[in-house]
Amino acid sequence: IRRPPRSTLFPYTTPFRSGGFSPELLEKIADPIVGMEIPFHYRNKAQFPFGKDKNGVTVTGFYAGRTHDIIANTDCALGVEQNQEILETILSFMEQYQMEPYDEKTGKGLLRHVLIRYGFTTKEIMVCLVINAKKIPHCEKLVELLQKIEGMTSITISVNQKNTNVIMGDSYEVLWGQAFITDYIGEIKYQISPLSFFQVNPVQTEKLYGLALEYADLKGDETVWDLYCGIGTISLFLAQKAKQVYGVEIIPQAIEDARKNAQINGIENAKFYVGKAEEVLPGYYADYAKAHPGEQAHADVIVVDP
């Protein structure tokens, strides 16, 4: 575990969140948290809901605490600066074509959310519009407007017509460009689709993975299991130093992305399984014992990131 440093934005107001340890004990047993030099505009992913304010004006922004009332805001200090131009472009388009935002109470209206992803090293931008219909009227005009934004690489829609708090639909359709953007963590290149899980803070992610690599102290002959591996971000990072890496993830699309990411990086010592970690790992050990009588599989390092 790590503790907040003495000069910190995160004071000891809730020691329970640190496992119930007192600040005095944490000082002795834990290293300081590794913070950011500039903790602003660091998120590579943002999701904004659309709705109407009390005056009936279409807005986007963030939900007020414990409500689904939207506080209008297109300029968030945590997201990338390109978000504002994208949001204002969409709002202008909706106004021009008198397009209604989704209303949770009635189930009517078109636009529910927009997902924006940004590649910090590649400068590529993805926009995924979540809609309560099969298509967007005058869609070609919106695509034309979004295309003009520097770095735009992928424009997609995801249909979600369910009465649910889940943001994304089950799939997506490409309107323009690629189905993904790319970005790097260290020297590893990743393809990121609208439904991919990818760490939202790339600066801290590289620090985190660097520490994981340091603690693992890999010499090149180890077997590593990465449980809850997502699209293989840390699996592939560790595969550079390990003999063999196995990744486990319950979401099939994430495993497809992980396999693609291994392929585009030319990494052949990473294998990925779809399923629950508590089922895949024992199953692998049992199968190994049957195939290799008298031998027992073992993991030198296990990474857990649920």
Predicted regions and their residues:
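Short, small-residue-biased leader/transition segments that mark boundaries at the very start
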Residues: 1-15
